[in-house]
């Protein structure tokens, strides 16, 4: 572990002495390098069950992830420390990132952890706080914070790795969803005109029927295969924010905290995408009424045809993609201090 830090209290400089409303003005920068311990334990070991079967494929050649962090920031306090502002810009580069790399299907081996490349995360954080006692009976405090970060691979083995519905690709986010682009629902006309579908049109039956999700043939080979999958978005939100509010009036006090995240893709699964699955109760809900029906074949229905085996309709695709941004009240508390009343009772 190595670290270097530089800071300067600007408000102590002679040319700042007349700015009396500034209580503290600090500029700082730091750079450090360390090994990353935020990874699963014993990844170098192969684990077997009681029957002698491998359930975790280890890698004895694993090395430490090496993290280099550059941070620059400003701390500002004003008006008798009533208003405080902090700002940080950071860049974190991780060498020898550990990723579970899938083996070829023919090998029959489990995915094994490997050091596959170099990744970068950079962004900024800002916090603003205000607190003031207006009178002996009234106190008020509020703190707001926002952070933004974005990741990308700088280097990775073979420029990309695919593990299930996750893709690791050079120049893209560290972990991205990997699936199909959806283009409404299939109609009988689509099949009559032989639009690209999963499995093609060999044989008397097809793998997809009217009411199934129509997927985009991104590589233009006239059939839908796993090669048509594309990145569908970063698995981690770029924006995170929070707020704390505190207020007191005499013996009455109020506290509240909110937090949330900006845009992040989420995908409907389980009961929503497969209402007849017994694992989730097997009972359709009210929102399933707007599904594709043979008597009303709407290509823009909210849900595909309902079936006990959704098959290809359950694939990860933009059809099930939604915006996962949210704001929530983490807690809210209203209190009353009976200290004065307790003194009277005690007296």
Task: State what each model feature region is.
Residues 44-85, 111-135, 171-179, 234-239:
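Outer-membrane beta-barrel signature, preferentially recognizing the C-terminal barrel domain
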Residues 20-65, 91-115, 154-157, 163-165:
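Surface-exposed extracellular loop regions of Gram-negative outer-membrane beta-barrel proteins
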Residues 261-347:
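Extracytoplasmic gating/loop element in the C-terminal half of outer-membrane beta-barrel translocons
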Residues 114, 131-235:
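Conserved small-residue
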Residues 10-25, 79-82, 133-140, 153-158, ...:
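Short loop/turn motifs that connect adjacent beta-strands in outer-membrane beta-barrel proteins
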Residues 27-33, 44, 85-91, 142-148, ...:
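Transmembrane beta-barrel strands of outer-membrane/channel proteins
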Residues 10, 31-33, 66-70, 89-95, ...:
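Transmembrane beta-barrel architecture of outer-membrane proteins
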Residues 2-6:
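Short, small-residue-biased leader/transition segments that mark boundaries at the very start
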